[in-house]
Amino acid sequence: MKIAVLSRNPRLYSTRRLVEAGTQRGHEMVVIDTLRAYMNIASHKPQIHYRGKPLEGFDAVIPRIGASVTFYGCAVLRQFEMMGVYPLNESVAIARSRDKLRSLQLLSRRGIGLPITGFAHSPDDIPDLIQMVNGAPLVIKVLEGTQGIGVVLCETPQAAESVIEAFMGLKQNIMVQEYIKEAGGADIRCFVVGDKVIASMKRQAKPGEFRSNLHRGGVASLIKITPEERITAIRAAKVMGLSVAGVDILRSNHGPLVMEVNSSPGLEGIEVTTGKNVAGMIIEHLEKNGGPNQTRTKGKG
């Protein structure tokens, strides 16, 4: 197969591994800088140009679209879909998963366990918002943040009020969530491919920190997940419409709670921790399911 990898940086671990795994399995892998591709939208024959030439003959596309380029990245991916190229994850699903609020609303509607969550812009009754999520300690998140940036743990109602007021002053939409103390600063990243969790790891925040992101100095280790956690991760990915996803779960006293569903999960942490060839399994999934004109939405979304 001829497979495009949409990525800003061919040197990133995840991009390198996908190219390696695809090449080893006999595919032609082409890395395309998402922002440098440009499109002919209104022709009877949809096209994407790159470095002065049309991109042609692709069977599948692997989107590795960073959060900051979601809008343009999804537009390029949608154009590939219009051209009948099979996407590993569809543009509609990626856009959906990048909207944290919409994601939680969809997961909640399907009865998937979530932390109690409030959403606000400039609430006229801050104490009531704080009470809504069972009071302090609580976590406040900026809607657009990634890698643990824009996430604050407030230990007291006073601290929570100050932080909410500060974000209001910045005209930010915020999420206010109950703090799951029993998780002990750890979460579980379940790596879903198709309808299986193919690998999972525990991420433990460094001492004195509550954010377990590896970018924040969190430490990854092997973990055996429960059947309930496995089912939750697979269902969460399915609700979002993602074939490949990193589902972040907290262990709480009332079962697994989904924190986030990531449409472009990094491979380095999970491969190094588990020793599994995750990139190879992703390519294998493409071989089984990919092929021209196999996209469900046909670029409609």
From Swiss-Prot:
EC number: 6.3.2.-
Glycoprotein is among the record's keywords: no
Keywords per UniProt: ATP-binding, Ligase, Magnesium, Manganese, Metal-binding, Nucleotide-binding, Protein biosynthesis
Listed GO biological process terms: protein modification process; SOS response; translation
EC top class named in words: ligase
Domain ATP-grasp stretches: 104-287
Residue numbers binding Mg(2+) 1: 248, 260
Protein name in the entry: Probable alpha-L-glutamate ligase
Gene that produces this protein: rimK
